[in-house]
Amino acid sequence: MELNSVILTTGSSVGFFKLVNYGLGKLPIPETARRNAWKWNNISTSFVHSLITGVWSVLCFCMHPQMAEDLIETHSVFSHALVSVSIGYFIYDFLDMVINQKIIHSWELLFHHVVVITCFGISVLTCRYVGFAVVALLVEINSVFLHLRQVLRMANLAKSTFYRVNSMINLGTYVVFRINTLAWMTRWLVLNRDLIPLFSYTIGSVGLAIMTAMNIVLFYRLMRSDFMKASREKELRKEKEKEKDM
């Protein structure tokens, strides 16, 4: 794709997700989420992005399986457009957070977005590593359940059966589509470093190191919030029941 096409696709994506956010803002919001309507709309917009790009990334490999054999040079217009659209979303979300939230509360996500925009930007501008970028977007399959978890918590449904089921699916997809994907990408980068220029290899290595560290921390937070806490509450209930029987 030419530079003009990249700019048009990315710019259109920024506008599209702005419209999505605007449209979501017109829908009813749970009473428990009204005190932070901006966060509710922001997470809901992120959910839409994850749903679109998660499905799109799988379709890229289904429609163009040759890309899996060569993640550097081989790609389709369909997969290139996916990466450009994702850049547009991350630019939109970056600006949305900078404008509506204190940086001290969102610096981790802002830093994450800068890293992703940089890495994906190199890919779409050089028309190389597009397949590698599409592999990275497979993590959005997990993000669907991750964002749904946040929405359910804001709607005060953290104790519902649906939330518990989503937590289990979220944990499973986290391991498969985040941890395993990042591990595979790191291995691929190391094995193919002779085929990658030093600058791109350095950017990719630093980006993956940052993503891996952030995802390990997030995994611990999820475990502590959804499983360790539930386990402790269950133990406390059992202790109280024993005390009643005595």
From Swiss-Prot:
According to the entry, every stretch annotated as the TLC domain falls at 35-231
Query: GO cellular-component terms in the record?
Result: plasma membrane
Q: Please give one Pfam family short name.
A: TRAM_LAG1_CLN8
- Where, subcellularly, is it found? Cell membrane
Keyword Nucleus annotated: no
Q: Which UniProt keywords apply?
A: Cell membrane, Membrane, Transmembrane, Transmembrane helix
Membrane-spanning intervals of the chain: 5-25, 43-63, 79-99, 107-127, 128-148, 199-219
Domain of life assignment: Eukaryota
Q: Name the Gene Ontology biological process terms.
A: membrane assembly; phospholipid homeostasis; plasma membrane organization; regulation of membrane lipid distribution
Q: How does it sit in the membrane?
A: Multi-pass membrane protein
Family the entry assigns: Belongs to the TLCD family.
Tell me which PANTHER family the record gives. Answer: CT120 PROTEIN, TLC DOMAIN-CONTAINING PROTEIN 2
Relate the protein's function as given in its record.
Regulates the composition and fluidity of the plasma membrane. Inhibits the incorporation of membrane-fluidizing phospholipids containing omega-3 long-chain polyunsaturated fatty acids (LCPUFA) and thereby promotes membrane rigidity. Does not appear to have any effect on LCPUFA synthesis.
Q: Provide the protein name.
A: TLC domain-containing protein 2
What organism is the protein native to? Danio rerio
